């Protein structure tokens, strides 16, 4: 396609309506029609990236292959489209301002007074068009975080207004709003949507398509009313009702011809149907599963979004193993030797979750010991893997005071130590070992059986590592180091071959699992959990 087309996705009425899912679904449908698509997220907060944000506030921090700490929506983009995103796919207000201020300090603006318009808006526009200009995508979908009406969003909306004016038919705005249901009146109310669109119109943007989020179906009359009062075409009002799974959304959008409407409005031919065969096959597998696999997630964060990618990876793996997933959250802060049997005895497998800091760490040791001694399939990820190693040192190697330098700087047996290159680091943000690194697998391991190859590449986010001083002792006692980074000799994977499935990875495999290509380790873990 000669020119890149830009689709902007904004949200109104309330946050957390699922702009990321709608953006991903649009991308999925366009990709299924043969177009080359990418998605980017603009977050209006002033942090440079979400790397230092509290998971309680913001959910998980996603990591791209090039080592950028990003918004969890990038996980949705990758899972829905099977693409790899980079630092350029997630921009924050903090990065926009930093870039402009750096240019001002260099003298790039030749003494001009730096203002929101044009300097900040020009920088936003440059970033919007960056991926399209560099990689010649057919479509760049840009999700704007936050809600229309927020002060923080105004520079982004002004940038969209300008881009729509500059690009003409090559730019389109999809506005997602919420239609509440009043139980007392037994009625859906469209007034908040009308006000949200008026707010958007007041900054000079007329949405081309409206997606209405609701718990209930909207009838044709209601959709016609919204079209009339919001000044959009009738066929450009689409409903997005709650679904049993987010992976149903692209199908529902296609049934309402959202993809056709977009192509028509952007002056592109509408030929044939999108190829959604593999997607529909996945959904068919998901809905036809009758048996259930119960997995415990042992971690300290109670917000489910803090483990979003792990949950999605487990769900995908369960589907491909013809099982439904039932997840039980176990708060590691309250897990003790006294109650661990009650919490974990009836689950089929356990994931010891990643995290940072002292809180809840002892509960993870308790879980690792219980699953090791009861031969229960166990998957430790990042800090979870480190907990497995520490527990093994304490209870098998006999180092009762073994620990990580992160938890106890004075531990005499630092089986987990700070990485050499991290010792001089003072800043917290963006300074960890981040992004994709090589790993070579032992061909005699369960991990190799899962991957079916010796060389893999996985994404990391950590400062601490397995201490190779203790490696020989671990191996002799039965915990094998089966995945090694060829450059640094860093231990990436540990496993106990004598147990059914007891594997810990320093990397985050959940970032590489997609709907149509589930991660081999999650597939293998679920397979072990369901085998009696």
Language model: regions and residue ranges:
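Glycine-rich, charge-decorated loop segments at or immediately adjacent to ligand/cofactor-binding or catalytic sites
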Residues: 182-189, 386-395, 496
């Amino acid at each position: 396609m000669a020119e890149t087309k830009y689709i902007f996705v904004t949200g109104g009425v309330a946050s957390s309506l699922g702009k990321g899912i709608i953006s991903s679904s649009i991308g999925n449908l366009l990709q299924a029609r043969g177009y080359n698509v990418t998605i980017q997220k603009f977050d209006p907060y002033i942090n440079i990236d979400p790397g230092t944000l509290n998971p309680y506030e913001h959910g998980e921090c996603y990591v791209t292959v090039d080592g950028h700490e990003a918004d969890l929506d990038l996980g949705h983009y990758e899972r829905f489209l099977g693409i790899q995103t980079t630092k350029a796919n997630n921009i924050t207000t903090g990065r926009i301002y930093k870039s402009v201020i750096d240019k001002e300090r260099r003298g790039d603006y030749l003494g001009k007074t730096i203002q929101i318009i044009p300097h900040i808006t020009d920088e936003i526009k440059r970033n919007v068009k960056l991926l399209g200009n560099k990689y010649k995508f057919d479509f760049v979908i840009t999700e704007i975080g936050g809600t229309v009406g927020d002060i923080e969003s105004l520079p982004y909306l002004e940038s969209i207004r300008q881009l729509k004016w500059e690009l003409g038919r090559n730019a389109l705005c999809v506005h997602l709003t919420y239609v509440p249901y009043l139980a007392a009146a037994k009625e859906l109310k469209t007034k908040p949507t009308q006000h949200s669109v008026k707010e958007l119109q007041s900054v000079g943007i007329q949405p081309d398509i409206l997606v209405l989020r609701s718990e209930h179906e909207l009838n044709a009359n209601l959709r016609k009313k919204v079209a009339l009062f919001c000044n959009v075409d009738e066929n450009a009002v689409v409903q997005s009702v709650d679904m049993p799974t987010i992976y149903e959304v692209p199908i529902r959008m296609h049934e309402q011809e959202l993809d056709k409407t977009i192509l028509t409005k952007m002056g592109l031919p509408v030929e044939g149907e999108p190829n959604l065969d593999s997607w529909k096959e996945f959904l068919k597998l998901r809905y036809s599963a009758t048996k259930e696999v119960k997995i415990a997630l042992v971690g300290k964060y109670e917000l489910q979004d803090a483990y979003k990618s792990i949950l999605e990876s487990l769900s995908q793996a369960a589907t491909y193993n013809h099982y439904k997933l039932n997840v039980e959250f176990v708060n590691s802060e309250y897990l003790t030797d006294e109650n661990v049997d009650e919490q974990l005895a009836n689950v089929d497998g356990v994931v010891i979750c990643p995290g940072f800091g002292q809180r809840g760490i002892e509960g993870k040791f308790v879980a690792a010991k219980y699953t090791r001694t009861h031969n229960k399939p166990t998957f430790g990820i990042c800090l979870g893997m480190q907990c497995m190693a520490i527990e093994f040192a304490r209870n098998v190697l006999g180092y009762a005071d073994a620990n990580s330098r992160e938890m106890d700087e004075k531990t005499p047996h630092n089986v987990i130590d700070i990485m050499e290159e991290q010792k001089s680091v003072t800043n917290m943000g963006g300074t960890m070992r981040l992004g994709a690194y090589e790993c070579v697998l032992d061909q005699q391991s369960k991990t190799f059986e899962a991957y079916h190859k010796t060389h893999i590449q996985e994404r990391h986010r950590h400062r601490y590592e397995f201490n190779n001083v203790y490696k020989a002792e671990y191996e002799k006692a039965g915990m094998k180091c089966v995945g090694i980074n060829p450059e640094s000799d860093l231990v990436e994977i540990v496993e106990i071959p004598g147990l059914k499935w007891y594997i810990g990875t320093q990397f985050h495999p959940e970032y590489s699992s997609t709907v149509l290509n589930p991660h081999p380790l999650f597939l293998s873990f679920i397979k072990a959990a369901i085998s009696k």
